[in-house]
Amino acid sequence: MSITEHRRPSLFRSFCITLVLLLSLGLCGCKAQPEADTFFFQYEGYFAAPVSSTLTVAITGFSTKEACAAVFQNAASMSFEGNDAVRIQKFSIEPHESIGAYSACVVRATLAFETAGVTDATALCVQFRDGSEQTYPIGTWTFDVQDAPDHAELLNVWSSPASNRVGNMFPYHYELLDRAASIRSIQYGPDQIADVADGITVYDGVAEGKLALSGDAPVRLIRPRIKVEQNGEAYSVYGICCYCGALDVTEADIQAAQDAASRTA
């Protein structure tokens, strides 16, 4: 028996297997995921909030096909996929200057925190006026909503940085409005809480410093919860949103976001 005769059954089996796979893919409607031509930057987010409150956040979108703002101009509503605890109350679309080959836009979304608890979101659902719907990956966001009202009268949080160049550091600057009160802790992630034992110091009524962030996401969105003690009672104060790493985003970071969106879409 020749070598060629030995190979024939193997080649025939390979042909049959390939044919079955191709037919299966066709019947299932499966196809290779194309590169996303419209996508959002993939953020890692932590948002502390009191129940029955709202917060406006900015989400950056990109398009390689047409003007990014034009893609969403006929959007009727937006929601987080699989998350009913956090509602997008309203939104606006703003054009942004292009970055390299990417047309950019900003979605300013007002989030309404209606239910206490810790929930996640990984995708934004956009419903358009023509009845169509599109889901866009946004990274991994955690919403930490508690039945603890915001005692903003105890702390000035507006002097804290709203953005920086370092994605793995959370900067803070808080000023006590009652010098008899004291800052006890800062929660800046689902399992990340810094207290006085971790080096939080207050000098002349001001707490200032930087807290290290785990992971390697290029940009983090962090809205912290600060615990303040006054007359022996602990109260919650909610900081402003900080876009850690947002001032140093590169075209390579945007390409990575496009690749991630293509994989998870």
Predicted regions and their residues:
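Aromatic sugar-binding surface patches on proteins
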Residues: 96-112, 203-210
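Extracytoplasmic/luminal low-complexity segments enriched in Pro/Gly and acidic/polar residues
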Residues: 194-265
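Bacterial signal peptide processing site
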Residues: 31-33
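Surface-exposed binding patches on compact interaction domains or structured appendages
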Residues: 66-102
